[in-house]
Amino acid sequence: MLGVGAGVVAVLVALVMFMGKEPSELLYSNLDLKEASEVTQALDQAGIKYETKGDGSTIMVPRDKVASARLMVAGKGLVSSGSIGYEIFDTNNALGQTDFVQQLNRQRALQGELERTIKAMQGVNSVRVHLVLPKRQLFEEDAEQPSAAVTIGVGSREPSSDMVRAIQNLVSSSVPNMKAEKVAVIDQHGKTLSAPSDESLAGKMAQDRKSEVEARIAKTVKDMIEGVLGPGKARVNVTAELDLNRVTTQEERFDPDGQVIRSESTTEASSQENKNDDNAGVTAAANVPGGQGANGFQQLGSRTGQNDAVTNYEISKSVTTTVQEPGTIKKIAVAVAIDGVSAPMAADGKPGAYTPRTAQEIQQIEELVKTAVGFDAERGDQVRVTNIKFPQPEDQGLEEQGLLAGFDKNDIMRAAELGVLAVVALLILLFAVRPFIKNLSAPAPGQIALAGPSGGPPVTRLVTLADGTQQQVVVDQSGEPIALAGPPVSDIDQRIDIAKIEGQVKASSIKRVSEFVEKHPDESVAILRNWLHEST
């Protein structure tokens, strides 16, 4: 009993000391040892208690001091995320430096700035950036392209493809003439996260697009069915076949009935020609000066004219360019499982009767699903709705989930501490306080406690012993003795050893007990049995 009590007290003291300790929270992690030393010195000067974990790179401070400690450390510039940025040019003197040193400092500064930017992303714990910047040569025809390698630490989870592409685009946009595919992204386990080629990147994007379409359609169908049947009454699975080809179509159409005069032009031409007739004879008129035929020839004349009209018509023409982006649904298959109707649980705890859905209800739900997904039988779409009995969740599990909802890790730990404290207090009551109270309510040292077969308020009666003396005995209502009065305290009793048992008893008490056993054997056996039962 003493050992159990001491153990309970020790546990209680340890628990009180643990609960009395101020809760701590993370200040910085994964620090460089030099920076960790500077931060701890600053915390000592500010009088802020701290605790280091791991190899010294993790610093914990009291929860109510986290904000002030971070502001103090940031104000002193003690933590630079382990990377050197453009501040390297603030301390170095450019005079006397060679071109190689200047280029190296420029590369280090660019790498440090990229590391800081990438580390600011959510989920990134550590990062290293290595840039390969080829030196430009005069009169070069094929310039070597720059490249980069980025190593990120993201813990136990795998970064998404969007994060990897964002890192590639960030690094390639920060370095002149660098392409995104020239940036290799690797995690802390040595796994390559960046796509090695455009084809694999396109395949990954296609798979993401397919998963996105299937999830969107499944959510739409499930929300619609659960809005009709109730929450948790539907399970939906969608398989979509997408056309991932990007098609550009250009079409020209001419309308002959829509012709319009564009331009008109008219050309008029005329000419006149006179000539002598050599076949005409000699006449008197030809010999008269100034008369007709004075030249001796007869003149013949001709006149020609030409009119040209040109009309240009513009025919109506329409040009249509159609671009079909990848992701068009070619075929879709939807599988829906719906639950039946379950009656409320009976008073004796038995589940209620289950009633499956009727064929008419299943047909109505199938029509709703076809309308929601844009069902097209010509392209081979399939929709199947089946009634299946769902397993009912346990009420206890739901209650536990509801109780834990809304509590963070600190609240759960605090509740666990209070629970342990309550258990320790209960153990103290059972093993320390209860025996103490029991001892207080026990008979006086001068009495021997006896147990009777029946209960009730005790009474006292005189019992004649073998030597003729009378002894007071405490009995219950049925007359069974439950206590034997001891001798007066003022008597001087002789003490003897019994079978070398450690401790001593009064000789007169032993004599009286022996006489009582001889006179009342049945009651004595009952008393011994009760003692044995209490000892076990």
Curated annotation (Swiss-Prot):
Q: Kindly state which keywords UniProt assigns to this record, in alphabetical order.
A: Bacterial flagellum, Cell inner membrane, Cell membrane, Membrane, Transmembrane, Transmembrane helix
Q: Where is region (Disordered) located?
A: 247-300
Ranges of Polar residues compositional bias?
A: 262-273
Which residues does UniProt assign to the signal peptide? none
How does the UniProt record describe the way this protein sits in the membrane? Multi-pass membrane protein
Database matches in InterPro entries: AMP-bd_C_sf, Flag_M-ring_C, FlgMring_FliF, FliF_N_dom, YscJ/FliF
Name recorded for this polypeptide: Flagellar M-ring protein
Q: Which gene name belongs to this protein? A: fliF
